[in-house]
């Protein structure tokens, strides 16, 4: 009899699914009620403030891709809330008073910020604090582009979203949150994944682009797009317990291709969905991205041009290292570059980097013949029929502790070759002629393990197609998914 251990292994009562749906609907309705209450309070405060409070009362309603019109002209209010003589109305003075009190920022800094337009690419772990702070600080027009929906496993780090928005568009969720914090700005929703076919059209409407994505081909694409449009690019990254931040293509700083003309090996490109990330780490980097975008927009301070900030969460250490300058030989921003907008739209970034343009899991590999693989259902039948076998789980030990199929033996793939004698002994204990079935999270590492095992003489080794992910989909829907 197969058993699973780990959170979620106990079956819900028959009405559990219905109860969960009702609770989710209640959360959604309560969130909508809170939003309406907030808008009512805002309108009431504007009425109490008199004529000054009416300035921009209906701002922030732009939602379509056409709401931001033309070459950096995305503006939230007539004159961005400033009087003809350049003075601020009472409501803006009160809202941004702590900015205005800063000698290095003051009225001029707020004016420049309110006249700027910034595009945030990605409404995830980096984009969440980034968008919230840009909205709260009063950027004139905030564009948000993302093609994904909110998932429950986003919420530990993507703090702009709420449980009530699970299953809904990330852009809508993020835009609603930004409008709740500041209804006086314009928020433009781009419900797409940014691609070569739409990136130029979207990005050319904004003054500054901020890369808050999590994959290599998109980084190259956004950098190339900003070079073609001559836009500054604030780029951040966070993975595991580390993060980094810099400003590309601004004040003589290099573009991404200047530093990395050749993509790194696929094995070196990790993703949050594979390697994990502590929730606060993208929060730290996202806040710093907002700071850099504000510095670029206002001309206040020294942006991280030609420098890269490195953050180590475990040691609480921040270092800033110098980068080499823009390369005159760069194929995209160099003096003799012939890269055009037409070239950009035809460029295959996934083939160039050998990576998918998605923040989700990497694509499945297929390196074994069909005879060396079995499905989850075939394995379940084998186990239920009591056929002698050994189930080998080759995930890292900390993955095995999250959830596993019992009984199974855990030998991480990285240690498999040195543990072969112990594996051989365990296989003998399982009985003569026992099958060796190999399992991992998604069915990729298990194939690599079977390749190694067959080379070392374990001729009957087979892997389970799709791994534990397929097990949860096809055999046990209550098995914990991570």
Curated annotation (Swiss-Prot):
Binding residues for Zn(2+): 255, 258, 330, 333
Keyword annotations from UniProtKB, A to Z: ATP-binding, Cytoplasm, Metal-binding, Molybdenum cofactor biosynthesis, Multifunctional enzyme, Nucleotide-binding, Transferase, tRNA processing, Zinc
Pfam family, one: ThiF
Chain sites annotated for binding ATP: 125, 146, 153-157, 170, 214-215
Chain ranges of the Rhodanese domain: 385-480
Pathway noted in the entry: tRNA modification; 5-methoxycarbonylmethyl-2-thiouridine-tRNA biosynthesis; Cofactor biosynthesis; molybdopterin biosynthesis
Details of cofactor binding: Binds 1 zinc ion per subunit.
EC number(s) reported in the record: 2.7.7.80, 2.8.1.11
Subcellular location(s) of the protein: Cytoplasm
Gene Ontology molecular function: ATP binding; metal ion binding; molybdopterin-synthase adenylyltransferase activity; molybdopterin-synthase sulfurtransferase activity; nucleotidyltransferase activity; thiosulfate-cyanide sulfurtransferase activity; URM1 activating enzyme activity
Active site: 272 (glycyl thioester intermediate), 440 (cysteine persulfide intermediate)
Catalytic activity: [molybdopterin-synthase sulfur-carrier protein]-C-terminal Gly-Gly + ATP + H(+) = [molybdopterin-synthase sulfur-carrier protein]-C-terminal Gly-Gly-AMP + diphosphate; [molybdopterin-synthase sulfur-carrier protein]-C-terminal Gly-Gly-AMP + S-sulfanyl-L-cysteinyl-[cysteine desulfurase] + AH2 = [molybdopterin-synthase sulfur-carrier protein]-C-terminal-Gly-aminoethanethioate + L-cysteinyl-[cysteine desulfurase] + A + AMP + 2 H(+)
GO CC terms in record: cytoplasm; cytosol
The UniProt record lists the keyword Glycoprotein: no
Cofactors (names): Zn(2+)
Main location: cytoplasm
GO biological process: Mo-molybdopterin cofactor biosynthetic process; tRNA wobble position uridine thiolation
InterPro entries: MOCS3/Uba4, Rhodanese-like_dom, Rhodanese-like_dom_sf, ThiF/MoeB/HesA, ThiF_NAD_FAD-bd, Ubiquitin-activating_enz
Physiological role: Plays a central role in 2-thiolation of mcm(5)S(2)U at tRNA wobble positions of cytosolic tRNA(Lys), tRNA(Glu) and tRNA(Gln). Also essential during biosynthesis of the molybdenum cofactor. Acts by mediating the C-terminal thiocarboxylation of sulfur carriers URM1 and MOCS2A. Its N-terminus first activates URM1 and MOCS2A as acyl-adenylates (-COAMP), then the persulfide sulfur on the catalytic cysteine is transferred to URM1 and MOCS2A to form thiocarboxylation (-COSH) of their C-terminus.
UniProt xrefs under PANTHER family: ADENYLYLTRANSFERASE AND SULFURTRANSFERASE MOCS3, UBIQUITIN-ACTIVATING ENZYME E1
Family: In the N-terminal section; belongs to the HesA/MoeB/ThiF family. UBA4 subfamily.
HAMAP family, per database record: MOCS3_Uba4
Descriptive protein name: Adenylyltransferase and sulfurtransferase MOCS3-2
Species whose genome carries this gene: Zea mays
Lineage: Eukaryota, Viridiplantae, Streptophyta, Embryophyta, Tracheophyta
């Amino acid at each position: 009899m197969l058993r699973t251990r780990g959170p979620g292994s106990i079956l819900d009562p028959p009405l559990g699914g219905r109860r969960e749906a009702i609770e989710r609907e209640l959360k959604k309705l309560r969130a909508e009620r809170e939003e309406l209450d907030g808008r009512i309070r805002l309108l009431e405060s504007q009425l109490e403030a008199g004529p000054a409070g009416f300035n921009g009362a209906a701002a922030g309603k732009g939602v379509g891709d056409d709401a931001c019109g033309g070459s950096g002209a995305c503006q939230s209010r007539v004159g961005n809330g400033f009087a003809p003589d350049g003075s601020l109305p009472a409501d803006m003075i009160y809202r941004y008073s702590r900015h205005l009190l800063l000698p290095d920022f003051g009225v001029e800094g707020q004016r420049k910020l309110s006249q700027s337009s910034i595009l945030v690419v990605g409404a995830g772990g980096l984009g969440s604090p980034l968008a919230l702070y840009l909205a709260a600080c009063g950027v004139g027009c905030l564009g948000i582009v993302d093609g994904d929906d909110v998932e429950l496993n986003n919420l530990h780090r993507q703090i702009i979203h709420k449980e009530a928005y699970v299953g809904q568009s990330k852009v809508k969720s993020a835009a609603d949150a930004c409008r709740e914090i500041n209804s006086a700005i314009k928020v433009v929703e781009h419900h797409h994944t940014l691609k070569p076919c739409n990136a130029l059209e979207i990005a050319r409407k904004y003054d500054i682009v901020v890369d808050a994505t999590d994959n290599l081909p998109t980084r190259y694409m956004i950098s190339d797009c900003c070079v073609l449009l001559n836009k500054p690019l604030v780029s951040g990254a966070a993975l595991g317990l580390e993060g980094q931040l810099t400003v590309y293509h601004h004040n003589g700083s290099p573009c991404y291709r200047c530093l990395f003309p050749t993509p790194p090996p696929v094995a070196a490109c990790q993703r949050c969905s594979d390697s994990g990330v502590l929730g606060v780490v993208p929060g730290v980097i996202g806040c710093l991205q907002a700071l850099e975008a504000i510095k670029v927009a206002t001309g206040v301070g020294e942006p991280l041009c030609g420098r890269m900030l490195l953050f180590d969460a475990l040691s609480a250490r921040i270092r800033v290292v110098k980068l080499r300058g823009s390369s005159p030989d760069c194929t995209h921003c160099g003096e003799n570059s012939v890269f055009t907008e037409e070239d950009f739209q035809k460029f295959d970034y996934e083939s160039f980097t050998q990576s998918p343009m998605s923040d989700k899991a990497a694509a499945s590999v297929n390196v074994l013949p069909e005879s060396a693989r079995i499905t989850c259902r075939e394995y379940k039948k084998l186990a239920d029929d009591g056929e002698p076998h050994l189930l080998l789980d080759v995930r890292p030990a900390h993955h095995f502790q999250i959830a596993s199929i019992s009984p199974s033996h855990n030998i991480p793939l990285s240690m498999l070759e040195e543990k072969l004698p112990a594996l051989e002994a365990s296989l003998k204990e399982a009985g003569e002629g026992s099958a060796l079935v190999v399992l991992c999270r998604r069915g990729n590492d298990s194939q690599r393990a079977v390749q190694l095992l067959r080379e070392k003489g374990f001729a009957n080794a087979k892997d389970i197609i799709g791994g534990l992910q397929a097990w949860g989909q096809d055999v046990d829907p209550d098995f914990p998914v991570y």
